[in-house]
Amino acid sequence: MKRTFQPSNRKRRNKHGFRQRMATKNGRKVLSARRAKGRHSLSVSSSMSASKR
């Protein structure tokens, strides 16, 4: 039986990335909540771009 989690960085970025969060009102709410909480990484893509460099 195939497991449910089949990791793919492209899908991860496109579904949970920074641009995707900014696209909707609720996504922006998520980002502001994470900023208020002082999260080290706001979204998936912001942490991924740092690891690529």
Curated annotation (Swiss-Prot):
Keyword Ribonucleoprotein assigned: yes
Biased composition annotated in UniProt, kind: Low complexity: 41-53
Residue ranges with Basic residues bias: 1-19, 26-40
PANTHER family: LARGE RIBOSOMAL SUBUNIT PROTEIN BL34M, MITOCHONDRIAL RIBOSOMAL PROTEIN 34 FAMILY MEMBER
Family: Belongs to the bacterial ribosomal protein bL34 family.
A matching Pfam family: Ribosomal_L34
Record InterPro entries: Ribosomal_bL34, Ribosomal_bL34_CS
Keywords attached to this entry: Ribonucleoprotein, Ribosomal protein
Region annotation (Disordered) ranges: 1-53
GO cellular component annotations of the record: ribonucleoprotein complex; ribosome
Name of this protein: Large ribosomal subunit protein bL34
Any Gene Ontology biological process: translation
Protein origin, superkingdom: Bacteria
Organism: Chlorobaculum tepidum (strain ATCC 49652 / DSM 12025 / NBRC 103806 / TLS)
